[in-house]
Structure formats: C-alpha cells, structure tokens
C-alpha cells in the first residue's frame, strides 16, 4: 500500500543516514588481500535525522568521527591492542560536545548529567563498566580501570566516581558536561534528540576483538536511571 511504502521509504532513509555516520577503516596485507585489522565506530546516528542536519553540522560530525577513527586506526596499524584503540577512539567522542557521551551528554530530569560506559576484551571475555557517574571526564577509561584493577564488572554512582579519582583519572565538576544544545533539548524534551550512544569495535593484528560504548542516556530521564549501554551482554559484547 502507499502507506506501507511511505513508511518503508522513511525507514530506508534512516538506515542510509545511519550508515553514513557509521565509519570503518580496515587494514589489508599486500599479498592475500584479507582484512587483518580494522575499526568500526558510530556516533549515535540513530538520533540524527536529515531534517535537523545542516551541511555545516554534517561536516562537523563527519570531521570529528574521522578524527576518532583515525586515532584508533593508527594504534592498530602500529600493532597496538584493540583495547587501546577502542578506548582512545571513544575518548575523542566523549571529549566532543557533538555526541551524547562525555562532554555532550544529555540532562536528567534533575538537570544533572549521569554517564554510563562499558568496555570488553574479546580475547579474555573480561569486561568493565561504570554507570550513573557525574564527575568522570572519560567514563570509557573508568570502565577499563574497573576491568583491570578490580574483581568487579561494574561500579555505579558515587562509588564509581570515587574509584576513578583513586585511579588518577581526570575528575571534573558536573557542570563540565553542560552544553546549551543539550539544555535546550531538556527544556523542549525533543524526541529527535532524546537519546544516543557512541560505540567502537576494533580488531587488532593479533586477532583480538574489543568493543566499547559510552552514553549520557535519555534526555529528561529520571536521575538514577541506568540503560543498557553499561550492561555487558546487552549494550556491549566482544568475543
């Protein structure tokens, strides 16, 4: 029917636009042409629509995604680990106000920012996560510290913030995460910008796979709410 065709058309446009904001680099040996290492990232493209995207904004998104992708790929190209590649790639997106992670995180209904992140090493099946953190500049790095420095899988809230400080990670005031765009989104509770997650999957030269995710969650979410992003096996997995 015309209705179903119209609906399918809208879905396909979103899929195409999602692919446009999901970027991948792959490295190939000179002889057999098989991919031996690579990197795939996304910047929360499920919440980015053509209607709300100017050419300038699109260029800015692509530029930052390319920067993140290049940084992670350089690590893999030099023989570095997939875990290092995932962490540095996501840190770059967390440091940008463009994405709903780190600096660009959305606001809770209490007007604060609560961030979640997780990382997993496919070679060992070890994972780490933080949830509901308010003062950790780069939650993805805290998630890795949980994995490597504790016998836990997840730390949440004040306990996670305190742990990150103990580990020497950079701590910021909660207002560091403030951006005018996200504050306005809270006021308007716009569906188009209510959620989003950044993510990265890397395969290194040793054949080890790692994955990481980071998010600010839902705009206007109830404070204390934790979504699927930091849940290993739900929002993130590598094997």
Per-region residue spans from a language model:
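Bacterial Sec-dependent N-terminal signal peptides
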Residues: 1-34
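Alpha/propeptide regions of enzymes that mature by internal proteolysis
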Residues: 31-239
